[in-house]
């Protein structure tokens, strides 16, 4: 994350987490208000969906459309899941809203030199796929949808002959991948507070049955908590050594997967804003150091 006149290259990784991503939206909006950007942003699930606005430089867009439509049955809900197989309605949430109702600024998005990558999980291999999103068009949005496709709550998303689901299954926090890109400074935005430890998936028996034809994907689901916690350990080590800068919630941002309360989304968003403002001097010092 760097201002345009700085010569150091900067990478940014955004964790997902459904509506906990409103925290990330708040952080990114404050950074945009202060003129901060980066060379390469990689996001998973909600991190990719809401990070989209960081490349298009649309302050307030993520919280605006989520508050506007979180209670709209066309946007998400059990009815959509029963009717289409997708908890978040593919046509409305991923096409009508970003293209017609609250459009992405494609001109700014495409002019922005920031490289933007989303993470998806290939259900055949169980491996993470890192896909660049240079255009912001409907094809790129399909990749965002794939990155955000929660197993069981969403059908696998077919793109170019492969099927994908939630990138968090394969790489919940893509920090190691980002470090491998070789940037001078690296920032990670988490959506869980300090001290969080991920537990084994409580519905693993059901997931084994649903995905019995995809053993590698099942293995990724089974080991997800282990990989996640190991990543947190690596981040803690790197953070202590001054190798990275981590922004994480200063208080709980726990929220239902299908939150219908705009005020609750606003609460989480404001925590992100406050944390971004509070950590801004330290972030700027890290970038300048």
Where do the protein language model's features map onto the residues?
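Patatin-like phospholipase
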Residues: 1-44, 52-289
């Amino acid at each position: 994350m760097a201002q345009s006149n700085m010569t150091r290259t900067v990478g940014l990784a955004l964790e997902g987490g459904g509506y906990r991503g409103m925290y990330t939206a708040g952080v990114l909006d404050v950074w945009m208000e202060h003129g901060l950007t980066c060379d390469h942003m990689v996001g998973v699930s909600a991190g990719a969906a809401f990070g989209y606005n960081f490349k298009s430089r649309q302050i307030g867009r993520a919280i605006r459309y989520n508050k506007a439509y979180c209670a709209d049955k066309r946007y998400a809900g059990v009815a959509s899941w029963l009717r289409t197989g997708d908890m978040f309605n593919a046509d409305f949430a991923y096409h009508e809203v970003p293209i017609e109702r609250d459009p992405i600024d494609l001109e700014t998005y495409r002019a922005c030199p920031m490289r933007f990558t989303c993470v998806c999980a290939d259900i055949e291999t169980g491996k993470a796929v890192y896909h660049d999103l240079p255009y912001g068009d409907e094809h790129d949005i399909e990749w965002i949808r794939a990155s955000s496709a929660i197993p069981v709550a969403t059908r696998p998303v077919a793109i170019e002959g492969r099927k994908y689901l939630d990138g968090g299954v394969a790489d919940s926090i893509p920090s190691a991948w980002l470090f491998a890109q070789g940037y001078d400074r690296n920032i990670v935005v988490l959506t869980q507070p300090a001290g969080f430890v991920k537990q084994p998936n409580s519905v693993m028996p059901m997931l084994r049955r649903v995905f019995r034809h995809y053993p590698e994907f099942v293995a990724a689901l089974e080991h997800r908590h282990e990989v996640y916690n190991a990543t947190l350990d690596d981040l803690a080590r790197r953070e202590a050594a001054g190798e990275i800068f981590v922004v994480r919630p200063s208080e709980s941002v726990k929220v239902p997967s299908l939150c219908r309360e705009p005020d609750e989304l606003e609460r989480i968003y404001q925590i992100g804003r406050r944390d971004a403002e509070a950590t801004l001097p330290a972030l700027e010092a890290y970038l300048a150091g």
